[in-house]
From Swiss-Prot:
Belongs to the peptidase C12 family. Keywords: Cytoplasm, Hydrolase, Phosphoprotein, Protease, Thiol protease, Ubl conjugation pathway. The modification Phosphoserine is found at residue 130. This is Ubiquitin carboxyl-terminal hydrolase isozyme L3. The record marks 89 as: Transition state stabilizer. It comes from the Eukaryota. Deubiquitinating enzyme (DUB) that controls levels of cellular ubiquitin through processing of ubiquitin precursors and ubiquitinated proteins. Thiol protease that recognizes and hydrolyzes a peptide bond at the C-terminal glycine of either ubiquitin or NEDD8. Has a 10-fold preference for Arg and Lys at position P3'', and exhibits a preference towards 'Lys-48'-linked ubiquitin chains. Deubiquitinates ENAC in apical compartments, thereby regulating apical membrane recycling. GO terms for cellular component: cytoplasm. Disruption phenotype: Mice have no developmental defects, are fertile, and show normal T-cell differentiation. They have normal anxiety, locomotor behavior, motor function and synaptic transmission, but show defects in spatial learning and working memory. Exhibit stress-related effects with profound apoptosis-mediated germ cell loss and also, prominent retinal degeneration with photoreceptor cell apoptosis and mitochondrial oxidative stress. Mice show reduced capacity for adipocyte differentiation and impaired insulin responses. The gene is Uchl3. GO terms for molecular function: cysteine-type deubiquitinase activity; deubiquitinase activity; peptidase activity.
Length: 230
């Protein structure tokens, strides 16, 4: 992904909520921390939940899995509803913003936008574009880039240098038309993880997150945040 490079966002609800507020999203839905994958910790997450973002390390093991998964889906096929809003990632370190766009775009009917919302405008203008066209559209969408840059400096840890290679990556897990989709702009298409519902989305998404952790048992750098009704 040569070309544009942004500063990475933290998987920190304060940062993501402030970012979305600046893009004109009404705070009737807010990101919250998921403190652990066990049922008693998941029970602390306010319901309903309409999306989960997972931050995870890109390791050699993961890259091997990603290649195998892609080849398997290409040979066996999968069902993906045309209702899924999916975009590719062409900007380095923009995965946090793309994860947020995926989370909001696939729950647009639940969201309230302020008048003149930058995010609402982006989603409306890109609704009929291909995933590749949406990626290009974001590259030239200065209002989102500037807001991302501001938010990247607002985290609890110091933002790395823009040239520093970052091996952490965000994906979004969302419910569309009765199925759980993993949306990752580094992948060629959405990944259908099977059936889900508004009521079981959090638990179903966390099962997918657990698989990421099981593939890399020596890694500790996993973090999940959930988009909950405020």
């Amino acid at each position: 992904m040569e070309g544009q490079r942004w500063l990475p966002l933290e998987a920190n609800p304060e940062v993501t909520n402030q970012f979305l507020k600046q893009l004109g999203l009404h705070p009737n839905w807010q990101f919250v921390d998921v403190y652990g994958m066990e049922p008693e910790l998941l029970s602390m997450v306010p319901r309903p939940v309409c999306a989960v973002l997972l931050l995870f390390p890109i390791t050699e093991k993961y890259e091997v899995f990603r290649t195998e998964e892609e080849e398997k889906i290409k040979s066996q096929g999968q069902d993906v509803t045309s209702s899924v809003y999916f975009m590719k990632q062409t900007i380095s370190n923009a995965c946090g913003t793309i994860g947020l766009i995926h989370a909001i775009a696939n729950n647009k009917d639940k969201m309230h936008f302020e008048s003149g919302s930058t995010l609402k405008k982006f989603l409306e203008e890109s609704v009929s574009m291909s995933p590749e066209e949406r990626a290009k559209f974001l590259e030239n969408y200065d209002a989102i880039r500037v807001t991302h840059e501001t938010s990247a400096h607002e985290g609890q840890t110091e933002a790395p240098s823009i040239d520093e290679k970052v091996d952490l990556h965000f994906i979004a897990l969302v419910h569309v038309d009765g199925h759980l989709y993993e949306l990752d702009g580094r992948k060629p298409f959405p990944i259908n993880h099977g059936k889900t519902s508004d009521e079981t989305l959090l638990e179903d998404a966390i099962e997918v997150c657990k698989k990421f952790m099981e593939r890399d048992p020596d890694e500790l750098r996993f973090n999940a945040i959930a988009l909950s009704a405020a």
